[in-house]
Amino acid sequence: RIGGERAFQLHDTYGFPIDLTLEMAAEQGLEVDQAGFRALMAQQKARAKADARARKGGAVATEVYAQLRRDGETQFLGYTDLEAESRVLGIVADGVLVDSAEPGDTVEVVLAETPFYAESGGQDADTGQILGSGLAMDVVDVQKPVPGLYVHQVTLTDGQLAVGDRVSAQVDAMNRAGACQAHSATHVVHAVLRQLLGPTATQAGSYNKPGYLRFDFSSASGLGGLKEELEGLSNQAIRDDLEVTSRELPLDEAKALGAMAMFGEKYGSVVRMVEMGGPWSRELCGGTHVARSGQIGLLSLIGEQSVGAGVRRVEAYVSQDAFRHLARERALVTNLTELLKVQPDQLVERVERMLGQLKAAERTISDLNAAQALARAADLAGHARDVGGLRVLTRQVQVSGPELRTLALDLRGRLGPASVVCL
């Protein structure tokens, strides 16, 4: 038996794919601790995310963030409000605490209260503006470099910003609405996957932003012919206009209710559970969501693929992006039907027939080229010279790879074993 730690070392240190480890182990009658491998991979992903957040927020500012955090947590108001009056607690520039910032500066701002959602749980951060008296700044990113502290990356466009300023934080409502649609659609996809594949189809990762979602799940074989059913059942759940609610409760109680947790994720004793249609979908989630599934609008599946041993990925467009995706596909089908002069339901058959004809034509051309090359063999053989007891033939010919091999072998046969042919 190959332990999960050894399989992970082969993958992480030596770049040996887990798929190949599984295949070679099976050939030798050995088992691989896949659960242990996945646990170590989850830990690595968590470390990578933490490192990415540190780099995004400025790793050198970690102690600065910790210092600001000791002065108090940021109160997040974004579940209910998209605007909030607040106070500037700190300004960070290039990893150093500063007292003020000028127009054109890009700095990080910590507020006492914020409606801005910080990137986490696979959901992109909010964008928007922070305004004050003669003051304006664009919020381009929000991170939580240390627990409880929301750090807003801003570009100051007007006025001078100072610690202690009273400001109004305003989230881009359209961008937030798109993020809510995509995140709720991710929960829909998760619930339908478990409905189709069973309880082993657990979440292995996700990413969602306005108009798009990506969802990784545990599965050995993937969806196969169930892709259309996944899309159809997901859109049925959207049309059912299921109520989406959230509540905080003890972790043990949430698990007893069947709430799904992200593999490898760490949770506190009290968690936030998001429900969609009551027990139909229950997940531990800190993200923002629509009030009802009907607000998602539409989901259009892009495709499914393998992203590792026992892990599959589905991608989909959501809401207006889904409608635009379908419109592009319809335009493509229309162009093809006009070009090939067939009905839409005959497209696959026509293309398959054309591909078959193309392959047959390529084989015919290859056979003709080979015949022409062989027809030249007798003439070419006549140009062979005797060199030290060997029949040597060197010639430049214009033929493709397969025909060149056929011609060379024919000439070797004509000239005998004591010959050298260089074409």
Residues of each region from the PLM?
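A glycine- and charged-residue-rich anion-binding loop/surface
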Residues: 1-423
